[in-house]
Amino acid sequence: NDGCIGPKSTAFYELRAKGGAGAVTISECMVHPKTDGSHAYHLDTAILNSLASFAYTADAIRRHGAIPSVELSHSGMYSGTYMTDKSRQHGLAQWGPSACVRPDGVEVGELSHEMIDEIVAAYGQVAGLAKRAGFEMIMVHGGHGWLINQFLSPWFNHRTDEYGGNIENRCRFARRVLQSVHEAVGPGFPIEFRMSGSELFEGGYTLEDGIAIAQELEDCIDLLHVSAGTYQ
């Protein structure tokens, strides 16, 4: 819980590689610690020695013939939810696509264009660091109620600018994130996008919407990883 990959976690991921997995994904790495940190076990490339633990784990996976991958995420309006450091939790502001009040009473601020630009750039920066640490694939977490999903969802996203409204606009943040990652890692480096095919609650996006989202982002990704549901 120090932002690094510990020896037990490394052994767990190496065991997956030994078992014959084609790719093994480490989860889940924050891209923008200033506005994120939902639980105690997030990885954080800003922590001293974290990249050394990344490199060691990537090598442990690769030595068994599997491709080491890392999942990049941002919790958005649910940042701080399960943090064990309560002093940091209480000092962490929550941000999402639109201003609202969470079901637990926490106020959420609307991300400005400047903050969106900063988070988009952070995805690329962390992806580049992961590549230098020896990872050969990136998973971008865009499902289950985290920030990218919040932009995709009409339930969370009530913006009236270029990031809200129709599906094309609601996909704009995800598209920019994926493009930022691609620019950082270069060609020939697979990008996996993890998404909820349907949010499975009234007011969220449907399976038909999920198909449209996948089609909208198809040209930005190499692999689509579909599950279902959301934090909400």
Provide a role label for each language-model segment.
Residues 1-232:
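Flavin-dependent oxidoreductase catalytic cores
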